Amino acid sequence: MTKQHAFTREDLLRCSRGELFGPGNAQLPAPNMLMVDRITHISEEGGKYGKGELVAELDITPDLWFFACHFEGDPVMPGCLGLDAMWQLVGFFLGWQGLPGRGRALGSGEVKFFGQVLPSAKKVTYNIHIKRVLKGKLNMAIADGSVSVDGREIYTAEGLRVGVFTSTDNF
């Protein structure tokens, strides 16, 4: 079977309902926390480390929920949502690889914010570069990522870590 290498909004919504990788496996959050509209490219090869990459996008409109509350009179997308989107994509990569279990963010190394997403922006692009995938008792991916708005890089994160767990009871 050939793996799919791009995913639409509807595909991602299916993933949020647990329908893409099967029950109990990697699942994206539902809207409003789903911070991705499409994955334009996903591969087991390529990226900075030759171990896989993802490119995904979020369309920006002034009526997105977070602009109304962060901050009143000074609307800006919270940086933590961009960071969470990168974790979402690393977890998606694990599910796409066929690794069983529910995804959980496990941390990151250095995170830098040097720009912002305003309501006037059109598109956020996420670039994820897989550094390592551990398979065994613990299934986990480690990646570096970046967030760009309208073609300008504004956040970076090193050492994004996400694991998938068949039981999260004792997590």
Swiss-Prot record:
GO terms for cellular component: cytoplasm. Its main location: cytoplasm. GO terms for biological process: unsaturated fatty acid biosynthetic process. The keyword Isomerase applies. One of its GO terms (molecular function) is trans-2-decenoyl-acyl-carrier-protein isomerase activity. Its EC number is 4.2.1.59, 5.3.3.14. Signal peptide: none annotated. NCBIfam families: fabA, PRK05174.1. Necessary for the introduction of cis unsaturation into fatty acids. Catalyzes the dehydration of (3R)-3-hydroxydecanoyl-ACP to E-(2)-decenoyl-ACP and then its isomerization to Z-(3)-decenoyl-ACP. Can catalyze the dehydratase reaction for beta-hydroxyacyl-ACPs with saturated chain lengths up to 16:0, being most active on intermediate chain length. Homodimer. This is 3-hydroxydecanoyl-[acyl-carrier-protein] dehydratase. The gene is fabA.
